[in-house]
Amino acid sequence: MDGVGLCANNKQKQNQMLPNKMRGEFTRNQRKDSEGLSEAPDLEFEYSDADKWTAELSELYSYTEGPEFLLNRKCFEEDFHTHLPDQKWTELDSVQRRAHAMRLLDGLEVIGRERRLKVARAILYMAQGTFGECSSELEVQHWMRYNVFLLLDVGAFTALVELLNMEIDNSAACSSAVRKPAISLADSTDLRVLLNIMYLMVETIQREEPTDSPEWRTIRETFKSELGSPLYNHEPVSVMLFGMVTKFCSGHAPHFPMKKVLLLLWKTILFTLGGFEQLQSCKISRRAALGLPPLPEDSIRVVRSMRAASPPASASDLIEQQQRRARREHKALIKQDNLDTFNEKDPYKADDSHEDEEENDDNDNSLEAEPFPLERDEVMPPPIPHPPTERMCFPKGLPWAPKVREKDIESFLESSRSKFIGYTLGNDTDTVVGLPRPIHESIKTLKQHKYVSIAEVQIAKEEAFQKTPLSGGEEELELCATELLYQGILPSLPQYMIALLKILLAAAPTSKAKTDSINILADVLPEEMPTTVLQSMKLGVDVNRHKEIIVKAISAILLLLLKHFKLNHVYQFEYMAQHLVFANCIPLILKFFNQNIMSYITAKNSISALDFPHCVIHELPELTAESLEAGDNNQFCWRNLFSCINLLRILNKLTKWKHSRTMMLVVFKSAPILKRALKVKQAMMQLYVLKLLKVQTKYLGRQWRKGNMKTMSAIYQKVRHRLNDDWAYGNDLDARPWDFQAEECALRANIERFNSRRYDKNQSNPEFLPVDNCLQSVLGQRIDLPEDFQMNYDLWLEREVFSKPISWEELLQ
């Protein structure tokens, strides 16, 4: 009894030493989760532009749309057998298939909505691979590719864009949807069918296959250039889709199927601008064109070769380990002999002791461990050698080559000169007179690792254009897909960013339902709500999956735009980034990560039996509550891990080299949120978390750094080093009071000057416009005078010319 009372008193004292919030966490039973995390293997996740083709196809459809597959088939077969009785699509020759496809396209031009919808469903069935005549999923995929290229060749995409524009401008449908109290799947039928066909075409054509014929390759390149050019309604398709997003968020079109719009927008941007591999190759060629040295390494390859680090521990883990160890020591004093005898026979002893040792080894970095300084030697024992199979193999040396900016060299020289010789030389980075030999060596090392970014060259060129607008000459503007897209979205870019973040907020798992939030479930909720438990569970899975796909699409859209704009021109990137910051993107992403991120990544919100194309080939098994709860057998959810990495990369892009935005991370207390995300054992995700922790480390205080040494070691090991970057201490010159408004206003002024100079031709300074001073040229111009002026010409001549004294000598000089 005494022993029990002593343990209870110790436990009570330890609880009292904890902060209130942590005390609540400690009372929850988190042991199972934390132990599972510490023992969890690395997630075998390969980051890429998108998931497998079949996964991307299946995510287009909600499970509620399942019955429409057979409806599409029925519409196609009725029309097909009317013109070609007793024949199959797969048995026709290419001429017959082309003729039927063109016949269907003609049907899209009829006035009657019902007839037009039936034809659109028949075309959708073609794009879905005419699955009724296929016996396997591979066969469906084969006919999908064939039919989609055929549809594109006969001009289906242009017709679909025109129909989509007509549906967007359909005021009757919009006003009807606004008046409805509850919007369901039936309100967006026409839009969903059109968007489904367009998405299947873009998604299928953008994926190259080794077996593609030269004709298909030519069609793909032509489609890619047309999709990124203002050929459809005098604007790129992406701009039209952005317009749908803002119209939906403004409440004027609540029936728009937003998941499909966002997926099509993402794939259109991905296809026209290029993915991450193309970005890397474009960056290499752009640096070569500017005369800059090549990149020190291939960042994509380096990240793929990295291994995940062990996750840091939480306070509850540390305390439970101490209690467990105290209990073991107490038992050892009472029954040492009996325990020795038992341990000889205990088959789990080795595993248990190894588990404790490994946890102790992992849990040496928590700030919350500070209230127990006397027990630090117990909390942090010497490292235990791991078995060879579990040892993490790092390449010799650090994965990244260090980089130095010109600004870093200047500041180092300035501080050295003022310290040793008492004067400064401004921006001079060559004069080293009077400085000691070690400083010479330091400068030499810094210059060896000097890195000039494309952005620095672009900023310097822009400054030159602003300083010398006349002698600077005309800027050579390459009208690539990125430039055309920026010109298209520039007038309404702030509204587009706000709309995307609104939808992201509504789809985030941490968001609570509010009356003023937008309804993003219009294209997933059925007309009749479920009546059984099984139907409710299925709809719950569908809704969660729907939200996850929306988060995935928005995160990919934002990241692709930021990266492409930064490569095209840094001020395009800064314009978009600044509006994201003004729309509270930073706290929104932090709010997203302020959840059990491991549960989000391992969520099983999918029913593989209902995924396309599996559901149209195989018979649907009987769904039970147990099978819905079990989900699939995957270690993690690809789309959720993809979304998390994208959001971290966006956060990193917004805050990089921005002191005021880095301080926002500190003010919003992002460190504990980000530290929890390190529990996900995936190298790329950990890298971007560590980058975000690194930039704010010097502002978090000595106590935080002291209590998080394992995190500091991981930063040193995985994040690129900037020579002279005093990130691990608070001595940096940047650790100063910050003025968010001043920094952002200065940046905004530069952005506005850039946009005004390059895109606002009407607002050009009249002083710099060309003037025709030749008298003969001016008098020789033909000017059309209005009819009333010609009738009253004599009056004008008398009033304005004859009655006023004119010095013709001065005028002609």
Swiss-Prot record:
Residues 307-316 have a biased composition (Low complexity). InterPro entries: Far11/STRP, Far11/STRP_C, Far11/STRP_N. GO terms for biological process: cortical actin cytoskeleton organization; cytoskeleton organization; heart contraction; regulation of cell morphogenesis. This is Striatin-interacting protein 1 homolog. The lineage of its organism: Eukaryota, Metazoa, Chordata, Craniata, Vertebrata. It comes from Danio rerio (Zebrafish). Part of the core of STRIPAK complexes composed of PP2A catalytic and scaffolding subunits, the striatins (PP2A regulatory subunits), the striatin-associated proteins MOB4, STRIP1 and STRIP2, PDCD10 and members of the STE20 kinases, such as STK24 and STK26. The modification Phosphoserine is found at residue 310. Its main location: cytoplasm. One of its GO terms (cellular component) is cytosol.
